[in-house]
């Protein structure tokens, strides 16, 4: 079984800022509690591997979860956060006021997304599918956590 786990609450979430791949964005205290809860829930699943995005907030989530699962995590660039281009570190409200709902535009393949340097849905889909294929081939019949 492949379990996708989003990183726990991070500083940018509480500030309503789109962090993208920005380094140095850490979990909040609440985020650390959330990661602990996730780790406790995963304890019973006999997790054999944890792969994580290389961004700080995902690594911090993985560090906490991995202690509960007794498995060391490995970083993998195929799980990295969406590259948000020019929208990186912008407040959500400003993005929506100037560009509308960029998330819907991302999924629909709008050219406005790529024109602003945002990674396309197809690009994200390709790298995540590569990761899933890797996990299926390497961890047959095992429980694996992918932290994004």
Feature-to-residue mapping (PLM):
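Generic enzyme active-site microenvironment
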Residues: 5, 76, 147
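Phosphate-coordination/substrate-recognition cap region in phosphate-metabolizing enzymes
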Residues: 37-103
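Active-site-adjacent alpha-helix immediately C-terminal to a catalytic or transition-state-stabilizing loop
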Residues: 11-12, 59, 67, 129-148
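Loop-to-helix element that buttresses phosphate recognition and phosphoryl-transfer chemistry
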Residues: 9-60, 115-129
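Short, basic/glycine-rich phosphate-binding loops at helix/coil junctions
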Residues: 15-18, 101-115
């Amino acid at each position: 079984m492949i379990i996708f786990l989003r990183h726990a609450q991070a500083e940018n979430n509480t500030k309503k800022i789109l962090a993208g791949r920005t380094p140095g964005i850490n979990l909040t205290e609440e985020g650390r509690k959330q990661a602990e809860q996730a780790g406790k829930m995963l304890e019973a699943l006999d997790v054999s591997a944890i792969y994580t995005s290389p961004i700080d907030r995902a690594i911090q989530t993985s560090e906490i979860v991995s202690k509960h699962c007794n498995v060391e995590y490995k970083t993998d660039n195929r799980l990295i956060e969406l590259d948000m281009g020019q929208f990186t570190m912008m407040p959500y409200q400003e993005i929506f006021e100037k560009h509308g709902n960029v998330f819907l535009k991302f999924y629909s393949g709008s050219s406005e997304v790529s024109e602003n340097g945002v990674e396309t849905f197809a690009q994200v889909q390709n790298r995540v599918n590569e990761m899933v294929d890797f996990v299926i081939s390497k961890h047959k019949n095992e429980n694996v956590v992918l932290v994004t």
